[in-house]
Swiss-Prot record:
The gene is rppH. CDD domains: NUDIX_Ap4A_hydrolase_plant_like. Belongs to the Nudix hydrolase family. RppH subfamily. NCBIfam families: PRK00714.1-1, PRK00714.1-4, PRK00714.1-5. Keywords: Hydrolase. One of its GO terms (molecular function) is mRNA 5'-diphosphatase activity. Signal peptide: none annotated. This is RNA pyrophosphohydrolase. GO terms for cellular component: cytoplasm.
Length: 159
């Protein structure tokens, strides 16, 4: 589902533990790390998409987490020209994202990145809250900065 401007509606998920760390996942067979994220299907709310993606990508159910907050606004990033799939119709030039900050309320042994039909990730780890900002692929960095600043205020972390 791509909007008239070429942006795909999407949800992003930041999962925190009780040590102030966040789940950081490596894309399948790539040296690229990111937070879980995924598209919103037609007829789905952002929250419904988030819970579906949460299970598909990391094997967690709604009872395993608590929603702490969401981004106030949708955040957008453009995909670099060389990564756009020009043969796809409609053409997707970027993502429009609603982000969710979740608190893990179960043991992290419930995290299962092999849960979906096609795994998105092949590894994961706990990292400090601000670590992802310097590690995420360059074209997502501004969205991560804006989202993480907003979330840090919500959970009263120093910037």
């Amino acid at each position: 589902m791509i909007n008239e401007y070429g942006y795909r509606p999407n949800v992003g998920i930041v999962i925190g533990n009780f040590n102030g760390q966040v789940l950081w996942a490596r894309r399948y067979k790539q040296n690229a790390w990111q937070f879980p994220q995924g598209g919103i299907n037609s007829g789905e709310t952002a929250e419904q998409a988030m819970f579906r993606e949460l299970f598909e990508e990391v094997g967690l159910r709604p009872k395993d987490v608590r929603i702490l907050t969401t981004t106030r606004y949708w955040l957008k990033y453009k995909i670099p020209h060389q990564f756009i799939r020009w043969d796809a119709k409609p053409i997707c030039i970027g993502q429009k994202q609603k982000w969710f900050l979740l608190q893990l309320v179960c043991k992290d042994t419930r995290i299962n990145i092999q849960c979906g039909k096609k795994p998105e990730f092949d590894s994961w780890k706990w990292v400090s809250f601000w670590y992802p900002l310097s590690q995420v692929v360059f074209f997502k960095r501004n969205v991560y900065r804006r989202m993480m600043k907003e979330f840090s205020r919500a959970i009263m972390l120093p910037e």
